[in-house]
């Protein structure tokens, strides 16, 4: 619902507000720029401003602008609003107009917040604003005030230079503005989990460098196509960042690895994969690696085996989904729109041995894997490059 005359969007952040004033200022500027980039990417007209504690959008299309802002990392919520003078008369007039346009009976409430210096407080806004709503609709309805469980709430936010009247909050992803953390290499397999892990890392402010290992006979065109589709979707959330997919030509190395290993094969494969990611990260200036692993989801993802594969790299391995159930991961994939293109079994399942070890000693893994495994990883990383991902 849009209030009559809506011309603005009030954009709120969360964790940014608990930072020191210097850090908050920097993060708010980044958030402002990211919201502006999201609007431009979607063809939504508007000017984006930063005020302390808020980002404001001035737009002739406030509904579309609010939707774009609500898809921006770091945004907790966005509300299409009408901007008025910060005085009780102007606020009351805007509330009365909103009530005449949208109140259709039942209980209502006025919920006001105020920041800055005024000759009234939020209780005054609630009282005077409630009277204005009541007077606007009492001839046609029998209005009821219910502050605990209203059918419709009229929101007011008063700031130093203006006030905003609005009716809805459009939830955003929260987190931190993208670009406020160092980038991470995100291993993207084409399965359900890895795009969600990459998205969660982006939600906490870290741009990702997507890395896909082309597995040769153990993958295939459909396998790579799912990874490309996932990256296209992730790119929609980062219009002012480069999410070019890096493809590592690992097929020959995987063939040699499969021929040389037995029950520890998947652990050696993951160690090889981490080492490729480490070299790519070093070249790209990334601070770590992101994977979609969750404890116990597969034999290679037991707590013991995760420790074994971690020892293949000196970089931190971030696992945003570490404690998530599969149902939660699947729900998140549906929510961010990566589920459809990543819901089929991925090629690396065909690489797994029949009876994989669930708690392999590191000595056994090292003894079983080829001595040149990490040299293969270095060579594969050297041949890794960005590829063009076609727009669907």
UniProtKB/Swiss-Prot annotation:
Pathway: Cofactor biosynthesis; thiamine diphosphate biosynthesis. Keywords: ATP-binding, Cytoplasm, Nucleotide-binding, RNA-binding, Thiamine biosynthesis, Transferase, tRNA-binding. It is found in: Cytoplasm. The gene is thiI. Catalyzes the ATP-dependent transfer of a sulfur to tRNA to produce 4-thiouridine in position 8 of tRNAs, which functions as a near-UV photosensor. Also catalyzes the transfer of sulfur to the sulfur carrier protein ThiS, forming ThiS-thiocarboxylate. This is a step in the synthesis of thiazole, in the thiamine biosynthesis pathway. The sulfur is donated as persulfide by IscS. InterPro entries: Rossmann-like_a/b/a_fold, ThiI_AANH, ThiI_fer, THUMP_dom, THUMP_ThiI, tRNA_STrfase, tRNA_sulfurtransferase_ThiI. Its EC number is 2.8.1.4. Residues 63-169 form the THUMP domain. It catalyses: [ThiI sulfur-carrier protein]-S-sulfanyl-L-cysteine + a uridine in tRNA + 2 reduced [2Fe-2S]-[ferredoxin] + ATP + H(+) = [ThiI sulfur-carrier protein]-L-cysteine + a 4-thiouridine in tRNA + 2 oxidized [2Fe-2S]-[ferredoxin] + AMP + diphosphate; [ThiS sulfur-carrier protein]-C-terminal Gly-Gly-AMP + S-sulfanyl-L-cysteinyl-[cysteine desulfurase] + AH2 = [ThiS sulfur-carrier protein]-C-terminal-Gly-aminoethanethioate + L-cysteinyl-[cysteine desulfurase] + A + AMP + 2 H(+). ATP binds at residues 187-188, 270, 292, 301. Belongs to the ThiI family. This is Probable tRNA sulfurtransferase.
């Amino acid at each position: 619902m849009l209030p009559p005359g809506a011309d603005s969007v009030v954009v709120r952040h969360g964790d940014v507000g608990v930072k020191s004033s210097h850090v908050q200022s920097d993060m708010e500027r980044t958030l402002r720029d990211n919201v502006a980039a999201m609007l431009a990417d979607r063809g939504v007209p508007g000017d984006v401003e930063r005020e302390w504690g808020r980002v404001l959008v001035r737009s002739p299309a406030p509904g579309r602008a609010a939707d774009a802002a609500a898809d921006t990392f770091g945004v907790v919520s966005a509300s299409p609003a009408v901007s008025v003078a910060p005085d009780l008369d102007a606020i009351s007039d805007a509330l009365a107009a909103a009530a005449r346009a949208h109140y259709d009976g039942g209980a209502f409430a006025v919920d006001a917040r105020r920041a800055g210096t005024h000759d009234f407080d939020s209780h005054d806004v609630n009282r005077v604003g409630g009277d204005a709503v009541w007077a606007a609709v009492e001839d046609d309805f029998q209005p009821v005030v219910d502050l605990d469980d209203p059918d419709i709430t009229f929101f007011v936010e008063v700031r130093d230079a203006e006030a905003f009247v609005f009716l809805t909050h459009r939830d955003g992803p929260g987190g931190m503005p993208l670009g406020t953390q160092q980038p991470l290499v995100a291993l993207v397999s084409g399965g359900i989990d890895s795009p969600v892990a990459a998205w969660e890392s982006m939600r906490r402010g870290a741009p990702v460098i997507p890395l896909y290992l082309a597995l040769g006979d153990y993958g295939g065109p459909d396998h790579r196509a799912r990874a490309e589709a996932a990256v296209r979707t992730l790119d929609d959330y980062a219009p002012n960042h480069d999410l070019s997919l890096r493809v590592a030509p690992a097929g020959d190395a995987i063939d040699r690895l499969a021929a040389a290993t037995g029950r520890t094969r998947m652990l050696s494969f993951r160690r090889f994969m981490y080492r490729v990611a480490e070299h790519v990260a070093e070249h790209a200036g990334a601070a770590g690696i992101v994977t979609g692993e969750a404890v116990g989801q597969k034999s290679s993802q037991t707590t013991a085996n995760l420790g074994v594969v971690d020892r293949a790299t000196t970089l931190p391995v971030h696992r945003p989904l570490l404690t998530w159930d599969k149902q939660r991961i699947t729900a998140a994939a549906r929510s961010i729109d990566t589920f459809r293109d990543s819901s089929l079994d991925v090629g690396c399942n065909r690489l797994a041995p029949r009876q994989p070890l669930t708690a392999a000693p590191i000595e056994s893994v090292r003894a079983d894997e080829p001595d040149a495994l990490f040299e293969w990883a270095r060579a594969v990383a050297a041949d890794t490059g960005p590829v063009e991902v076609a727009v669907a």
